[in-house]
Regions:
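Short alpha-helical segments and helix-capping/turn motifs at coil-helix boundaries
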Residues: 31-37, 78-82, 108-119, 165
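Active-site-proximal beta-alpha loop/turn segments in soluble metabolic enzymes
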Residues: 144-149, 181-198, 219-233, 290-291, ...
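Active-site loop/lid in soluble adenylation, ligation, and acyl-transfer enzymes
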Residues: 75-78, 90-101
Length: 433
């Protein structure tokens, strides 16, 4: 194995001349469109998307999970893996933690002090926390089988609330600034739950969590149209989510997971409405074909990802007060090296962001005012079809990253090295990580 830095240096040296040629060609193209390529490189350099701690391990399905070599066994090892991704792509300096999977130990390796030290050494920070009340944990007094924050039994709801408060405390110790709540509460059969009462209990539980938020924190909630409950999910669409957030409190905002919608829903229109309502908190980026597939971002529907960023960039350029969405990848890497998937996904998200900055906003506004549907689509497609790869690579190089992150990663031999140091994890039946 060679170090990541050595791999980047060697691989970049072999690719630099080609990058310079491609960059110069794109620069001339963009000049004809009166676009400053250096400004786009600066935007790509400044873009940030967080990595989920659970994303560096192998995912799975409800049928099976097939462990990969060198999977991280502890939070410290997850930090090491996230550090590798960041060293190569340079847009992922923050992590999101899931409790209790990432709960710090009381003392020794894995305690708060050692976690903070490892984060500092890897150039990372903790951005957000995530609670888990969709699984029962060993030794847990009460079960979430029939719900958590919306359970009919107050004692179960109180247990779920206390778990979220624990997440806030851990996050405060580690420097986080937001907390995300997703629940699997719902029903599999008609009549199983009382729809209105369940929402009432949900809002009441969230209000208790919202009241305990540390200063400067935001609370994100996300809906899901189905799964794990299949007849009804308590928080089943974006409208219900928005109304609940409004009831909960000013710092409760909507988080959009691209896979949590019904098939063919116009997600970019939902994003636009949340921006208008000043209710957009952030994103969990992934891709899907049929449901909440959690595939690599941009792998199936890259144009949809671009259209989402078209709305986000439009709001950014307009300077809408309070517009500061948090971006994170949320994926399940079942058949790939998770670090490679995270690198590719991060690059695809930045790609969509930069492409959205290529949209001729004045021309688009004119086409919309004139009801010129064909011209409007042409303007969007012109931006989407522009290959901005040289811009993304130049931004990475500027920050010390790799021209081709996956190639440099493979050349380093990192996966084989950690595989020899980390014993294989047993396959779990649930496929959940």
């Amino acid at each position: 194995m060679i170090t990541i830095a050595e791999a980047v240096e060697r691989d970049n040296a072999a690719r630099r001349a080609t990058l310079d040629e491609d960059y110069a060609h794109l620069e001339r193209q963009l000049e004809r469109r009166h676009v400053d390529i250096k400004a786009l490189v600066a935007r790509a350099t400044a873009f940030r998307v967080a990595i989920p701690s659970w994303g560096v391990g192998t995912g799975g399905t409800r049928f099976a999970r097939f462990p990969g070599p060198g999977e991280p066994r502890t939070l410290l090892e997850k930090i090491d893996d996230c550090g590798v991704v960041q060293s190569l792509v340079r847009v992922t300096p923050a992590m999101s933690l899931h409790i209790p999977w990432d709960k710090p130990r009381e003392s020794g390796p894995g305690d708060v002090a050692s976690i903070r030290a490892r984060l500092l050494a890897r150039g990372l920070a903790i951005e957000s926390m995530n609670s888990n009340t969709f699984q029962d944990q060993p030794g847990q007094p009460l079960s979430y089988k029939f719900g958590s924050l919306t359970h009919t039994d107050f004692a179960v709801r109180r247990q779920a609330i206390e778990h979220n408060l624990e997440c806030l405390a851990i996050g405060r110790d580690l420097g986080a600034s937001s907390h995300t709540v997703w629940i699997g509460d719902g029903g599999n059969f008609p009549g199983q739950i009382h729809f209105r009462h369940a929402i009432d209990r949900y809002v009441e539980s969230l209000q208790a969590i919202h009241a305990a938020l540390p200063d400067g924190w935001r609370l994100f909630i996300e809906h899901k149209c189905y799964e794990p409950a299949f007849y009804s999910t308590v928080l089943n669409d974006w409208g219900i989510r928005y109304l609940c957030a409004r009831e909960v409190g000013d710092r409760c905002l909507s988080l959009v997971d691209l896979g949590h919608h019904a098939p063919n829903v116009n997600i970019e229109q939902i994003v636009a409405q949340l921006i208008r309502l000043r209710a957009l908190g952030g994103f969990h980026f992934n891709d899907s074909k049929f449901g909440d597939d959690d595939l690599d971002s941009g792998s199936i529907k890259p144009f949809q990802l671009f259209l989402v960023f078209n709305e986000l960039v439009d709001a950014e350029l307009e300077g809408i007060p309070g517009f500061a969405p948090a971006y994170m990848l949320d994926q399940s890497h079942n058949v790939t090296d998770p670090l490679e998937s995270l690198m590719v996904s991060a690059m695809e998200v930045v790609r969509a962001y930069v492409q959205a900055h290529l949209v001729d906003r004045a021309a688009l506004a004119e086409a919309q005012a004139n009801n010129d549907a064909v011209r409007a689509l042409q303007i969007l497609k012109a931006a989407f079809r522009t290959d901005v790869s040289p811009i993304l690579a130049a931004a990475r190089v500027r920050e010390g990253g790799a021209i081709d992150p996956v190639a440099a990663y493979r050349a380093s031999g990192y996966r084989a090295s950690v595989a020899s140091q980390r014993p294989a994890l047993a396959s779990g039946g649930s496929g959940i990580v």
